[in-house]
Regions:
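Short beta-strand-turn/beta-hairpin segments enriched in glycine/proline and small hydrophobics
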Residues: 1-21, 39-52
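Generic structural signal for short, solvent-exposed loop/turn connectors between secondary structure elements
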Residues: 1-3, 64, 77-78
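Short hydrophobic beta/alpha edge segments that flank linear recognition/processing sites
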Residues: 26-48, 69-78
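Conserved beta-strand segments that form the floor/walls of ligand-binding pockets within enzyme
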Residues: 6-8, 61, 75
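Short histidine-centered loop motifs in beta-beta connectors
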Residues: 15-26, 30, 53, 59-66
Length: 78
């Protein structure tokens, strides 16, 4: 059964900590509870999006630089 990682805020979702950097995590990677999987930017403020469970990141539901709203599913883990 998949578990959802939900956006806490509206804004732009980023999979990388900055231009030219590697993504925080890729699909198929193991993820730990509390691990950062991306950032949401709103008005030049960045908030980390963290996994709530240990597992494997199955799929990102939002593209890098995609618009998210509170409650949107960002990724699925198993």
């Amino acid at each position: 059964m998949s578990r959802q990682i939900i956006s806490p805020l509206p804004g732009i979702f980023y999979r990388k900590p900055g231009p030219g950097k590697d993504p925080y995590i890729n699909e198929g990677d193991t993820v730990s509870a509390g691990q950062t999987i991306g950032l949401v930017e709103i008005m030049k403020q960045f908030s980390e999006v963290r996994a709530e469970f240990d597992g494997v990141l199955e799929k990102f539901e939002v593209d890098d630089f995609g618009v998210v709203n509170p409650g949107d599913v960002i990724a699925l883990t198993s």
